[in-house]
């Protein structure tokens, strides 16, 4: 009974309104030719051929051309994430390297200060000219030429300090601070000399 009502409710429209009505309902972008309707047999054969050609063209095109922008944006996003991860790894590596360098420098300073304190504990009476070698042990990375320069400079400095300052410095802390000052003076003077 529902089929009979559907058949009765269907009314055919004149061909001019069919063509105009089909223009509004069309999803295909091909224009109508001279008012022919969408259901005419002339257009149906051409449309089937065009549709099959378009699908095969799309398949061939997908093999030749790069993927659509959506896939490209995913790969670009993946690439950016990898670059950020590498940057993060590089930053962590650099901070770890700086930390290890600082630890190594602090250990070398502690060892040098222990050597200076030990040297001052042995020789508390005088600061003689033979002692500049202990300062050279604090700076183990110097080249041979720099060590000779340091030794000569320290001998002159200690000879002068022996007369002026060392007799007035009674505590080991004062002597240690003076050693720090001498080391800084030597490092600064060596940088100016070799640059």
UniProtKB/Swiss-Prot annotation:
Disulfide bonds: none annotated. GO terms for molecular function: protein serine/threonine phosphatase inhibitor activity. Belongs to the FAM122 family. This is PABIR family member 1.
């Amino acid at each position: 009974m529902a089929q009979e009502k559907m058949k009765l409710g269907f009314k055919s429209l004149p061909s001019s309104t069919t063509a105009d009505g089909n223009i509004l309902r069309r999803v295909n972008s091909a224009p109508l030719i001279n008012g022919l309707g969408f259901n005419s047999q002339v257009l149906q054969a051409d449309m089937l051929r065009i549709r099959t050609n378009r699908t095969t063209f799309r398949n061939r095109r997908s093999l030749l051309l790069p993927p659509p922008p959506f896939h490209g944006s995913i790969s670009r996003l993946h690439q950016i994430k990898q670059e950020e991860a590498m940057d993060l790894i590089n930053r962590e590596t650099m901070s770890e390297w700086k930390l290890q360098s600082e630890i190594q420098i602090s250990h070398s300073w502690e060892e040098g200060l222990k050597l200076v304190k030990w040297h001052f504990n042995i020789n508390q009476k005088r600061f003689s000219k033979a002692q500049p070698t202990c300062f050279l042990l604090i700076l183990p990375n110097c080249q041979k030429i720099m060590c000779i320069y340091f030794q000569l400079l320290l001998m002159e400095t200690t000879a002068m300090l022996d007369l002026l300052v060392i007799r007035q410095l009674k505590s080991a802390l004062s002597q240690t601070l003076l050693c720090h000052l001498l080391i800084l003076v030597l490092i600064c003077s060596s940088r100016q000399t070799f640059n």
